Amino acid sequence: MNTSLKTSKRQTQAPRSLAQHARLDMEGVVGQQSVPLLKALHILTREGQLNQDSRRKLKQVNHLVQLIEAPLRECAASADFSEHHPLTLVDHGAGKSYLGFILYDRFVAQHTSGLDAQPAKSRNTDLQETKSAMALQVFCIESRPELVEKSAQLAQEFGFTGMKFLNVLSQDAGAQSEMPAKVDVVTALHACDSLSDDAIEFAVSKDAKLIFLVPCCQAETASLLKSNRALFIHKTPLAELWRHPLHTRELGSQLTNVMRCLYLEALGYMVTVTELVGWEHSMKNELIVAKFTGQKKKLAAQRLVALLDQFGLEALLKTRFARVKEPLTA
């Protein structure tokens, strides 16, 4: 083989510049999303660049969207949804409504306006769009009025008519007149402390078919463990699991999510737990996915009650897990 030709070929393949690497990396993160929308959300800078914090947030939301897409489309295909009867998704603790905007853009706006209707630089055209539009209505629940107002203005600017923003606590969202009697999907991304429990209660009360939770800062259980530490340290060696404050927080977090999964199984949901993103992006990356099957597991309810008793958390049976009724027999 002609080695000079081989060398010449290598020499003509110039290495990628840092700018090219940055562009490819940004395209990989931004994907099919609307660049103008990401700029309006301040995820991208005015120049269309990503900073480290924005990169982390966008990767988290995009990964969640990827995990949601298949079950969401399956749910949409299982019923006769239309413009007059759309699939309803409710996002609790919406904050700046990143998730709601990106979901609506991904499943509705890109199809109704068409990719060709936007400038070539507005989207990553390397990715091919093959999915059909979805009849989707998105409710974003947020307690901070300034965020709700800004999100509503942004939705109006982009013509996202299927998005609604409610300035209300998650625990009160179900009683709002704008809220349908039944919803299809409930999400709560990085839902702090008991917000995940409020989202679960909302989802169950509204007969939600799908629930996606990324819990965060589970302080309630840790506080209860701390309060009963002195009593239980003399009753059971299990109390060593929460004798030290650091272990109390860790155990409280783990135990809370385990009990939430059991609770959902007891109420007729099939539950899976997976990782939202890699550890390098967030330490709070546990994703709980629940799909309603109607098959209530009595064993799950029994084990939930047993755990509450074992760890001195019986009070939660009347608050967070009130739909599980005692006594439970095999």
Predicted regions and their residues:
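Class I S-adenosyl-L-methionine
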Residues: 2-39, 47, 51-55, 62, ...
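Intrinsic-disorder-associated, low-complexity terminal segments enriched in Asp/Asn/His/Tyr and depleted
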Residues: 124-126
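Conserved alpha-helix/loop element of class I SAM-dependent methyltransferases that forms part
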Residues: 60-83
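Short helix-capping segments at alpha-helix termini
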Residues: 109-114, 129-134, 158-160
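Short beta-strand element of Class I
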Residues: 136-139
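Conserved class I S-adenosyl-L-methionine
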Residues: 85-95
